[in-house]
Swiss-Prot record:
UniProt cross-references to InterPro entries, sorted A to Z: DNA/RNA_pol_sf, DNA_pol_Y-fam_lit_finger_sf, DNA_pol_Y-fam_little_finger, DNA_polymerase-Y, DNApol_IV, PolY_HhH_motif, Rev_trsase/Diguanyl_cyclase, UmuC
Cofactor comment: Binds 2 magnesium ions per subunit.
Similarity comment: Belongs to the DNA polymerase type-Y family.
Subunit structure: Monomer.
EC code: 2.7.7.7
Organism of this sequence: Streptococcus suis (strain 98HAH33)
Keyword Ribonucleoprotein assigned: no
Matches recorded under SUPFAM superfamilies: DNA/RNA polymerases (SSF56672), Lesion bypass DNA polymerase (Y-family), little finger domain (SSF100879)
Entry keyword set: Cytoplasm, DNA damage, DNA repair, DNA replication, DNA-binding, DNA-directed DNA polymerase, Magnesium, Metal-binding, Mutator protein, Nucleotidyltransferase, Transferase
Name of the featured protein: DNA polymerase IV
Required cofactor names: Mg(2+)
GO annotation terms (biological process): DNA-templated DNA replication; error-prone translesion synthesis; SOS response
Annotated UmuC domain residues: 14-198
């Protein structure tokens, strides 16, 4: 017996567009000498004392296992010949605006997820084109013809599947998932590929012996709800290709944060500071990637006994700089103290964004 009704609207036409290695692609476009070389957007560890994280990198760098949020030091160790570029985020914002202008030629139902990806509902569109695949091809053509950049696109009847589809053929790919194919495609995927299923949920699913979409299909609804609460029903629906989440035109990101849970409690100050610095770097990279600056820094600490404290401080100016965020977080952890209790979780968030 189903606890919640399974309602699936198959009439919608949703496109997910994801720019390919966006920041790095812009740099290669503007400096042709970089073509074919591994390019990393992030601080050069040879100039920053080994500090910094990778904001993004091109596909040549990804061939070495480099990815976003990796430390610049590790990226250099994997690929010493890589070219590090600190990044011009104002330029990236302007190109992102140009990409969004292209989207709006076809529909005003656009939900930006970040500077380089968005969902489009083209069920009803400005050009009266009945084929979502044709619209996706036109968008890819416009982006290449006008901006000399490539984008991957996924087309399906909901956002979840459109996102899955856009990840299936990169770069410059276009994948369509039809209703009759959805369950079979999802069944073949590892649960890590399910958008919205985080690392902790994946670990818990693995503990249940659930590794693929097919494994998830075989788990009764009540078992998932007992284990994951309301999110268990979402998992039950995802495995069946069901999602009715609308494209939210007014979506506004209000904060940017990262947190990490530790299986072994942290007791030493140097270990805590090392983790906090890493979190600050990742938050700053996320802010820059999304073109955001904030002025309120929030530190979250959860102890071994599961008690949780948060501390915040507001700056006079808006920032997206690692050094500024780190300075405030160091002050906040000093104010909180009590490291000797053992720390189970640390989190850093920047909010109160510049409008």
């Amino acid at each position: 017996m189903l606890i919640f009704p399974l309602i699936n609207d198959l009439s919608r036409k949703i496109i997910h567009v994801d720019m390919d290695a966006f920041f790095a692609a812009i740099e290669v476009r503007d400096s042709p000498a970089l073509k074919g070389k591994p390019v990393i957007i992030g601080a050069d560890p040879r100039l920053s004392g080994g500090r910094g994280v990778v904001s993004t990198c091109n596909y040549e760098a990804r061939a070495f296992g480099i990815h976003s949020a990796m430390s610049s030091k590790e990226a250099y160790e994997r690929c010493p010949q890589a070219i590090f570029i600190s990044g011009n985020y104002e330029k990236y914002q302007e190109v992102g605006r140009q990409v969004r202008e292209i989207f709006h030629r076809y529909t005003d139902l656009v939900e930006p997820m970040s500077i380089d990806e968005a969902y489009l509902d083209v069920t009803e569109n400005k050009l009266g084109i009945s084929s979502a695949v044709k619209i996706a091809k036109l968008i890819q053509y416009d982006i290449w013809n006008e901006l000399h950049l490539t984008a991957s696109a996924g087309v399906s009847y909901n956002k979840f599947l459109a996102k899955i589809a856009s990840d299936m053929e990169k770069p410059h790919g276009l994948t369509l998932i039809l209703p009759e194919d959805a369950v079979g495609i999802l069944a073949s995927l590892p649960v890590e590929k399910f958008h919205g299923v985080g690392k902790k949920t994946v670990e818990r699913l693995h503990e249940m012996g659930v590794y693929t979409g097919q494994d998830l299909l075989d788990v009764p609804e009540m078992v998932l709800i007992d284990r994951f609460g309301r999110f268990g029903f979402d998992l039950y629906r995802k495995a069946r290709g069901i999602s009715n989440s609308p494209v939210k035109v007014d979506r506004v990101r209000k904060s940017s944060g990262k947190e990490r849970t530790y299986r072994k409690l942290l007791y030493r100050e140097e270990d805590v500071l090392k983790e906090l610095i890493s979190l600050c770097q990742r938050v700053a990279a996320s802010l820059k990637r999304n073109g955001k600056k904030g002025r309120t820094i929030v530190l979250k600490v959860r102890y071994g006994d599961f008690s949780t404290l948060t501390k915040r401080h507001s700056l006079e100016v808006y920032t997206d700089q690692t050094e500024t965020i780190e300075k405030e977080v160091r002050q906040l952890i000093e104010e909180i103290g009590k490291i000797e209790k053992g720390i189970r979780l640390l989190g850093v968030t920047v909010t109160n964004f510049q409008t």
